[in-house]
């Protein structure tokens, strides 16, 4: 995840809005449709900060235990982006059941709800580096869903790098030798781990911090964050081959 950190505390400003929304208004809904009602009860707390600044931790009331509710139905993506669709299906199948991976993200219902919102939001665009899979940047909003119990954040921009490992089918030799966790960078498993990594930046943990700390511009921290997700999700990621 990449996010600018410029600006000073003196310049920082906050504007907080509480909106009971009939639908999640923070991300375009034209690219995908779903029969799920899980986006019908979102409480959106919008925190606007000076450009380049962001809150270091979730809101005080963001960390909640997800209630025992049905897992949201999968999105029916209308995009022609087959890679995005297959990646979404892989990660949905990882998170839809109660297992070590979905529990890390707060339970299947919570994890799938936020995965759906992230998938609706991210767009395919080129970035400078061929090694970056996703980039999240800009201001973000804090959201609480009343049905699933999911509290999470969404950034202004979430980009899937069209020049990066998610989409590049013909990597150069040196690039092909790189890995995400234990998985070679252009494999199905690595792509799933990359999307799960981004999900970890959006959800709070039981300690009151984001599951994964911001790692924009810090390659070592990014690798550590991927290893954290891998520790909880490796069995489910490996099962994608079966």
Predicted regions and their residues:
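Bacterial N-terminal signal peptides
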Residues: 17-26
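Predominantly extracellular/secreted Zn2+-dependent metalloproteases
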Residues: 7, 27-192, 202-242
């Amino acid at each position: 995840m990449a996010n600018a950190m410029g600006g000073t505390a003196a310049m920082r400003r906050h504007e907080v809005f509480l909106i009971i929304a009939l639908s999640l208004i923070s991300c375009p809904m034209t690219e995908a449709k779903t029969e799920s009602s899980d986006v019908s009860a979102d409480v959106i707390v919008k925190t606007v900060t000076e450009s380049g600044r962001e809150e270091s931790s979730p809101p005080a009331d963001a960390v909640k235990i997800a209630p025992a509710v049905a897992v949201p139905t999968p999105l029916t993506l209308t995009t022609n982006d087959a890679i995005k669709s297959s990646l979404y299906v892989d990660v949905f199948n990882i998170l839809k059941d109660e297992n070590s991976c979905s529990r890390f993200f707060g339970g299947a219902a919570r994890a799938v709800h936020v995965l759906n919102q992230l998938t609706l939001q991210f767009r395919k665009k080129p970035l400078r580096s061929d090694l970056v899979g996703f980039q999240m940047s800009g201001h973000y909003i804090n959201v609480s869903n009343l049905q699933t119990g999911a509290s999470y954040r969404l950034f202004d921009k979430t980009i899937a790098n069209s020049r990066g490992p998610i989409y590049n089918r013909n990597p150069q030799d040196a690039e092909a030798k790189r890995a995400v966790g234990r998985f070679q960078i252009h494999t199905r498993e690595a792509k799933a781990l990359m999307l799960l990594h981004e999900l970890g930046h959006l959800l709070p943990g039981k300690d009151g911090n984001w599951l994964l700390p911001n790692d924009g511009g810090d390659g070592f921290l990014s690798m550590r964050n991927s290893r954290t997700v891998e520790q909880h999700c490796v069995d489910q990621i490996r099962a994608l081959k079966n």
